[in-house]
Design a protein with these regions (language model features):
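Conserved beta-strand positions in the central sheet of alpha/beta enzyme cores
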Residues: 40, 73-75, 111, 199-202, ...
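Charged helix-capping and loop-helix junction motifs
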Residues: 52-59, 88-96, 122-133, 185-192, ...
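Conserved H-loop
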Residues: 70, 146, 239
Length: 252
């Protein structure tokens, strides 16, 4: 929880409700009870735009208001990478729909994974990924909500190279300090290098075990230097949300 982190006056903390594994209305109450001021909703499995009626939407907004919670961001998870051509059109259409839904709900950021960035820009998979992300960036420009990618064992150089090739509209980064630690990357250095792309930050922790494997652990028990990272976010006047997410273990 955010109580395990140093206090930073200007930073905003949200909870990813899907990790509570509860019905959404209960999840919202749980998020409020742990001191979050915002929530991140999964708009593929938890709250499908196509299944939310106008009345349902009003009820959701009312409940959030009653609990003094804001919608921080949406998550759109996919099973396959955005450079895997199998059922790619459906994934892209789903993500575009999530961006439209986000804007209609006053949300400006949708996070998700695109798969590990291929190493060589000349590979067909790399070119396909750039084509897809430029298409999504154009859509973001049109609808007013931006896709922020959560890295998958990608280096700073790999991320920077990809961002440089997405020129048709905005593309952001969902900084995942635990994922970076588990991939042998430094979250602070990554933020320094790509700070202008960071739209959202995940609050989860990780470490490298004796075999060099990445392991997710409760916040404060891993190798993420939170004092330094949060101080840097505050100094840089970071305006996005820090979202508590824990994808494994009992102490979520």
């Amino acid at each position: 929880s955010k109580d395990d982190l140093p206090k930073m006056a200007s930073l905003r903390f949200a909870a990813a409700t899907r990790h509570f594994a509860q019905p959404i209305r209960q999840s919202i109450d749980t998020a409020a009870s742990i001191g979050a001021t915002g929530v991140q909703l999964d708009v593929r499995n938890e709250l499908k735009p196509t299944e939310l009626s106008e009345t349902g939407r009003r009820h959701l907004i009312r409940q959030l208001g009653e609990q003094r919670l804001e919608l921080a961001s949406f998550e759109y998870p996919t099973r396959r990478a955005f450079h895997d051509s199998a059922q790619l059109d459906a994934r892209v259409a789903g993500l575009k729909g999530a961006l439209e839904f986000a804007y209609s709900m006053g949300v400006t950021v949708v996070v998700g994974r695109v798969g590990r960035i291929p190493d060589d820009p000349d590979l067909p998979a790399y070119k396909l990924l750039c084509e897809v992300l430029n298409d999504i960036a154009r859509h973001s420009n049109k609808v007013g909500a931006t896709f922020a990618i959560t890295p998958s064992s990608d280096s700073v150089e790999g991320l920077r190279g990809l961002f440089e090739r997405i020129t048709d509209g905005p593309l952001g980064l969902n900084l995942d300090p635990a994922g970076l630690i588990m991939s042998n990357c430094d979250p602070v250095e990554t933020y320094r290098a790509l700070y202008d792309r960071v739209l959202s930050v995940q609050i989860r922790d990780g470490l490298r075990d004796v075999d060099g494997q990445g392991v997710e652990v409760p916040v404060g028990r891993g190798e993420v230097v939170w004092d330094e990272l949060l101080a840097m976010l505050e100094e840089g006047a970071f305006r996005g949300w820090l979202v508590a997410t824990r994808s494994s273990g009992d102490d979520k």
